[in-house]
A protein has these predicted regions:
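General structural signal for secondary-structure boundaries
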Residues: 1-2, 80
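Short acidic/polar alpha-helix capping motifs at helix-coil junctions
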Residues: 2-5, 29-30, 50-51, 89-91
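Short hydrophobic/aromatic-rich motifs at helix boundaries and adjacent loops
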Residues: 8-11, 35-39, 58-59, 95-98, ...
Length: 189
């Protein structure tokens, strides 16, 4: 029986490289399509991941969801004060860090999304300052007949300031631009 999730030869090549190169990487996603599929697929196919997640407000729901996710989603890192430290440690150990990056953050860095100013969570760019590593986006595109296409982006190069340091705002704008491109391409997702 064919899989309900398809991917291109290039996505498979990028994924295999990330899994087999022995280096850490940061993988970002947004709330498009079925955004939990990439974490499930990555772990199922051998990618060592630490995944940032936000706990539900209900403790009972949190316990049930965490039990399910822990079996299938690798190392789970709850959002909070300690999350950046834990994610940085995961990168230093050579793990891949995955996170959703498209939610408004009141004390975030200013980025432009569809011509409007908004605030992005700077954690991804700050982690790059600790451990320079490749950054890729991943998305799931809903297809007809309950099928999906997984796509891994080419590497998103961090923006650097005049001194060669990772530019937090510029890097988050580059990531936001990728997400804007995804929405423009498939606005119904």
């Amino acid at each position: 029986k064919p899989s309900r999730i398809e991917f291109s030869a290039r996505t498979k090549q990028l994924f295999d490289t990330l899994r087999d190169d022995g280096k850490p990487a940061i993988i970002f996603a947004s709330h498009l399509g079925n955004w939990e599929i990439p974490a499930l697929g990555a772990v199922a196919h051998g990618l060592d991941c630490a995944i940032l997640f936000r706990r539900p407000n209900s403790e009972a729901a949190d316990r049930a969801i965490e039990r399910t996710r822990a079996i299938k989603m690798g190392t789970l890192v709850p959002a909070g004060r300690e999350a950046p430290l834990k994610l940085g440690e995961a990168l230093q150990r050579g793990q891949h860090v995955a996170m959703l990056v498209d939610q408004y953050m009141g004390n975030g860095v200013e980025v432009t999304f569809f011509g409007r100013k908004t605030k992005a969570n700077p954690t991804l760019a700050r982690l790059l300052r600790q451990v320079e590593c490749p950054v890729h986006g991943v998305r799931i595109i809903r297809l007809p007949n309950h099928r999906f296409r997984a796509e891994l982006s080419e590497e998103v190069k961090p923006v650097r300031d005049a001194a060669g340091q990772i530019d937090i705002q510029g890097t988050m704008q580059a990531v936001t631009d990728v997400i804007e491109g995804w929405v423009r391409e498939y606005p119904d997702q």
